[in-house]
Amino acid sequence: MKLPIYLDYSATTPVDPRVAEKMMQFLTLDGTFGNPASRSHRFGWQAEEAVDIARNQIAELVGADPREIVFTSGATESDNLAIKGAANFYQKKGKHIITSKTEHKAVLDTCRQLEREGFEVTYLAPQRNGIIDLNELEAAMRDDTILVSIMHVNNEIGVVQDIATIGEMCRARGIIYHVDATQSVGKLPIDLSQLKVDLMSFSGHKIYGPKGIGALYVRRKPRIRIEAQMHGGGHERGMRSGTLPVHQIVGMGEAYRIAKEEMETEMARLRGLRNRLWNGIKDIEEVYLNGDLEQGAPNILNVSFNYVEGESLIMALKDLAVSSGSACTSATLEPSYVLRALGMNDELAHSSIRFSLGRFTTEEEIDYTIDLVRKSIGRLRDLSPLWEMYKQGVDLNSIEWAHH
């Protein structure tokens, strides 16, 4: 077993060796290096064929028509294109958007930008377990609501929203529904031929493909229109201009093909490992599971260890690559906005760790992790005056701390 152990698969994944090998064939002179938009020679045709195959592989994993897949630079761009593109196109119908407080920043900050441009956004607070109350969602819908954006799987706590029911609710009212499926694609079944979802964002690097490539699903029946945000040569049916990066697209396609083949067995394996990890640490005193094991993605476990400072815990766990909060926001010292939206106090939110498991995680690594976490929590609490006071029965919430 090699240290450190990587348990941050929700931040990014290593490229699968099969994917890397495939990508290598699309870079150099002796490979397929052409521009897929070059129509006058075989270098272009071969590149275009490779892109078509990858587009099919992505569509097959999610039950879509390949013509509904638009390539982007990643899920952040897909979220921006979906939300800004739909809002701008349909703004004559209304200017009201609904989302939730626990969405990824790529959705939240896009909505903030639209607010500056005169749109009105309702931010729903989830229940304690992170799931959106559908009655609250229904109550928030208005005649001028044009778009709902609610994710499939949360990147920090792993809870799964009921996108099928939300889709039905939106379709019945003629509201466009966007789903950020970055954390769920290739891990949970998605069938867009059955789901009433209009726009869906995908990423390559969360499912063993390369970074810098993603896609946006744009429904054809009923046809959804979006306004381009990137202008140029009119690539991707006018929705996203820019030369297609064939090697990255091929990599994403291959990653999605592998995910489709291995999803069922791999998810059962990961669920087993995640449960093993939770069972190994859940009897530590003052340990709280954030999210919901039953309604959760099989590979994410978010836990708070009370009376332990999150940053010191991460340093104590230096042999584990884990995160407190998501990679996109863990550079700030603010506690996770997702956990705060669940109504958690700052102390608990600060002491949370996200373990996210993946394709190369082993049972041996999980057992090592359990052992290390137990030892580290014990050691850090031995040093903590707060823990000592808690053990003596002092109610820490009732203490008036002196401000120096």
Swiss-Prot record:
Catalytic activity entry: (sulfur carrier)-H + L-cysteine = (sulfur carrier)-SH + L-alanine
Binding of pyridoxal 5'-phosphate, residues: 75-76, 155, 183, 203-205, 243
Pathway where it operates: Cofactor biosynthesis; iron-sulfur cluster biosynthesis
Protein localization: Cytoplasm
Protein's UniProt keywords contain Kinase: no
Cofactor: pyridoxal 5'-phosphate
Record GO terms (molecular function): 2 iron, 2 sulfur cluster binding; cysteine desulfurase activity; metal ion binding; pyridoxal phosphate binding
Keyword tags: 2Fe-2S, Cytoplasm, Iron, Iron-sulfur, Metal-binding, Pyridoxal phosphate, Transferase
Binding positions ([2Fe-2S] cluster): 328
GO cellular component, one term: L-cysteine desulfurase complex
GO biological process, any: [2Fe-2S] cluster assembly
EC number(s) recorded for this UniProt protein: 2.8.1.7
Active site feature: 328
PTM-bearing positions, type N6-(pyridoxal phosphate)lysine: 206
Main location: cytoplasm
Function: Master enzyme that delivers sulfur to a number of partners involved in Fe-S cluster assembly, tRNA modification or cofactor biosynthesis. Catalyzes the removal of elemental sulfur and selenium atoms from cysteine and selenocysteine to produce alanine. Functions as a sulfur delivery protein for Fe-S cluster synthesis onto IscU, an Fe-S scaffold assembly protein, as well as other S acceptor proteins. Also functions as a selenium delivery protein in the pathway for the biosynthesis of selenophosphate.
HAMAP family named in the record: Cys_desulf_IscS
Assembly mode: Homodimer. Forms a heterotetramer with IscU, interacts with other sulfur acceptors.
Family designation: Belongs to the class-V pyridoxal-phosphate-dependent aminotransferase family. NifS/IscS subfamily.
Protein name (Swiss-Prot/TrEMBL): Cysteine desulfurase IscS
Taxonomic lineage: Bacteria, Pseudomonadati, Pseudomonadota, Gammaproteobacteria, Enterobacterales
